[in-house]
């Protein structure tokens, strides 16, 4: 006699009930040959369902041995048991256990997805099985659109999808009317005639009599095992290929991609089924990611705005001033900064441009209009040194400086104050105190955080200011613009050394504007980091919310998880499905968060009329994607792991 296809040896199944241990199965010995049709019959509580769960590798014996096709199951891990269910067993449940969000064909295809069957053959086989079972017009129907008998036919087709060498039918007629139940039994007998091994679990002896062998179970023990050789045979189901599914050996990569696409599809269906909950969960991610990206963009925009203002005062410049420091009371009495120092500094290789500076206040008059303004005596290179741009006319040249020319360049505020908006100031003569000067240029307005934006400024040659207005020879300061190839610190040291050589004493100090830039960058970086950390904390809170929602989802979909495990899903497949769902929620939220942040940037720009721009970087957006992905993985892992470790028997029993 050939080796049994199924063999149980002295199997016990015990459960803990408080401090006691309850034996549900006792000393069960059973062997079933390939091609048999066996009915296991017993009253409710007799242990027949527990026996079926052990036969289908959904549960394990507490003691004893169980072999399937010669393979001992005792030491198999959960994934090896899943392989047995996938490759050998097909389940037909009393309550059908079809997934409500999938079509009839998709429900039938599910075991083949986990078996790694290619999509083309998978679609063809599922459709062929449904057609043979009389459902050719119902391939795309959802379970809710099918009658009970049609749903059970879909369940039978699903059991046959991977070949269904052993079909376990648990009360297959229990939820059906008599006529439909008889039709299901006829199909099972035809499948048995085609070579499938059928194990029929029922409490109804009239149903059990359709089998060739009836095993009675009571109080966890087999009390009767009778063969019925007189049972009438039936022809095989027309067109059935027999127990083995005709599929090529699966390619690991393709099989993994197919399972991934199935997980993605189920994630999308689950999200769509709970749209409000998904949107509320996603809203937290959207706000968190938008906050992170916006904070970084605000920090970068603020930093750039301040640096632009520093540039307006002079980009990469070093100022030489009398005294020891700002506010030195003796600075006014030091008169050693002179024009010769300017010429010496201008000859240095690190000097891009140099301008002396003296400043005073004076009354500015044009005809009958008088205003108070600041008069600055500077050199011809002043626009280059300070980044001043001319809107109209020109700046005075070296010749005007040499001849102490009475030329003046005015700012836009002075133009408005003296000439209004209708008179062209170029060529007009104004009085600076008692000194007449011809207007040769108007500077562009400068938006700056530093200084008074409403102040009036005019610029004249420093030689003119010294001789005609101030009546002195010494300068208030000298500003050197350092060329781009020289580090500011090196230029500062070289200027200090040169001035010490010229003056013979430290009667001056230098101020490097690069110090302001470095301070601004450090400050903005610190503030950006601080606010970003607050945003990250909010993302962690959002992540906990995602984990909570996913745990709720696992609880709601426990039965679905049990069905997937019954048809052969590995633990990794279940974990992958829920991880993908969590990551998908977070990724979509991340994308929408970035779009929200970009929209905020547009609104800020419009609200400030372009005066302030949020600066976005690809790095911050990539970081946002990484953050949203990590949130999905980190906070989706625990729910996914919880789902993967569910017991298939308990999951199937959950309503």
Curated annotation (Swiss-Prot):
It is a multi-pass membrane protein. One of its GO terms (cellular component) is plasma membrane. SMART domains: AAA. ATP binds at residues 42-49. InterPro entries: AAA+_ATPase, ABC3_permease_C, ABC_transporter-like_ATP-bd, ABC_transporter-like_CS, MacB-like_ATP-bd, MacB_PCD, Macrolide_Exporter_MacB, P-loop_NTPase. One of its GO terms (molecular function) is transmembrane transporter activity. It holds the Pfam family MacB_PCD. Residues 6-244 form the ABC transporter domain. Non-canonical ABC transporter that contains transmembrane domains (TMD), which form a pore in the inner membrane, and an ATP-binding domain (NBD), which is responsible for energy generation. Confers resistance against macrolides. Belongs to the ABC transporter superfamily. Macrolide exporter (TC 3.A.1.122) family. Homodimer. This is Macrolide export ATP-binding/permease protein MacB. It comes from Bordetella avium (strain 197N).
């Amino acid at each position: 006699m050939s080796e049994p296809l199924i063999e149980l040896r002295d199997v016990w199944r015990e459960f803990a009930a408080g401090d006691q241990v309850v034996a549900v199965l006792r000393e069960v010995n059973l062997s079933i040959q390939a091609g048999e049709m066996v009915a296991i019959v017993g009253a409710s509580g007799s242990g027949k369902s527990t026996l079926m769960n052990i036969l289908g590798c959904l549960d394990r014996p507490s003691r004893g041995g169980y072999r399937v096709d010669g393979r001992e199951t005792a030491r198999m891990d959960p994934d090896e048991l899943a392989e047995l269910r996938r490759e050998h067993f097909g389940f037909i449940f009393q309550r059908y256990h079809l997934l409500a969000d999938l079509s009839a064909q998709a429900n039938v295809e599910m075991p083949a997805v986990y078996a790694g069957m290619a999509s083309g053959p998978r679609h063809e086989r599922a459709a062929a099985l449904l057609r043979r079972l009389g459902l050719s017009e119902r391939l795309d129907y959802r379970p809710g659109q099918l009658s009970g008998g049609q749903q059970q036919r879909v369940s039978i087709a699903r059991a046959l999808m991977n070949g269904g060498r052993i079909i376990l039918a648990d009360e297959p007629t229990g939820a059906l009317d008599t006529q439909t139940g008889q039709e299901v039994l006829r199909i099972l007998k035809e499948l048995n005639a085609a070579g499938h091994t059928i194990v029929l679990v029922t409490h109804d002896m009239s149903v059990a009599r359709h089998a060739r062998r009836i095993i009675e179970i009571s109080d966890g023990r087999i009390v009767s095992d009778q063969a019925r050789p007189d049972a009438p045979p039936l022809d095989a189901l027309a067109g059935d290929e027999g127990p083995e599914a005709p599929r090529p050996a699966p390619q690991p990569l393709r099989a993994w991609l197919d399972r991934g696409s199935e997980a993605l599809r189920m994630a999308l269906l689950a999200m769509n089924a709970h749209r409000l909950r998904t949107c509320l969960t996603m809203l937290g991610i959207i706000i968190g990611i938008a906050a992170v990206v916006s904070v970084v963009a605000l920090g970068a925009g603020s930093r750039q705005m301040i640096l632009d203002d520093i540039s307006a005062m002079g980009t990469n410049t070093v100022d030489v001033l009398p005294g020891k420091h700002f506010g030195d009371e003796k600075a006014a009495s030091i008169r050693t900064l002179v024009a010769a120092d300017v010429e010496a500094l201008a000859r240095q290789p690190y000097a891009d441009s140099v301008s002396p500076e003296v400043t005073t206040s004076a009354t500015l008059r044009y005809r009958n209009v008088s205003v108070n303004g600041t008069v600055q005596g500077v050199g011809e290179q002043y626009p280059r040194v300070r980044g001043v741009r001319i809107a109209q006319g020109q700046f005075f040249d070296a010749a005007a400086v040499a001849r102490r020319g009475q030329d003046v360049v005015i700012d836009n505020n002075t133009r408005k104050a003296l000439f209004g908006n209708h008179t062209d100031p170029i060529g007009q003569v104004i009085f600076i105190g008692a000194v007449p000067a011809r207007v040769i240029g108007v500077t562009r307005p400068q938006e700056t955080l530093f200084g008074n934006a409403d102040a009036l400024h005019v610029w004249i040659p420093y030689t003119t200011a010294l001789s005609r207005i101030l009546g002195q020879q010494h300068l208030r300061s000298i500003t050197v613009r350092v060329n781009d190839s020289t580090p500011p610190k090196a230029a500062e040291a070289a200027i200090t050394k040169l001035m010490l050589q010229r003056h013979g004493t430290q009667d001056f100090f230098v101020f490097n504007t690069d110090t302001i830039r470095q301070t601004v960058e450090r400050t903005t970086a610190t503030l950006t980091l601080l606010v970003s950390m607050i945003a990250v904390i909010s993302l962690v809170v959002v992540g906990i919310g995602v984990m909570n929602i996913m745990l709720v989802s696992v609880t709601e979909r426990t039965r679905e998880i049990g069905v997937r495990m019954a048809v052969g899903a590995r633990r990794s497949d279940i974990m992958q499905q829920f991880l993908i769902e969590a990551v998908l929620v977070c990724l979509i939220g991340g994308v929408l968060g970035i779009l929200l942040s970009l929209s905020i940037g547009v609104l800020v720009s419009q609200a400030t009329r372009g005066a302030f721009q949020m600066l976005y970087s690809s790095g911050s957006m990539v970081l946002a994607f990484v953050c949203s992905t990590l949130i999905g993985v980190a906070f989706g892992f625990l729910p996914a792991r919880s789902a993967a470790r569910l017991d298939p028997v308990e999951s199937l029993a959950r309503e």
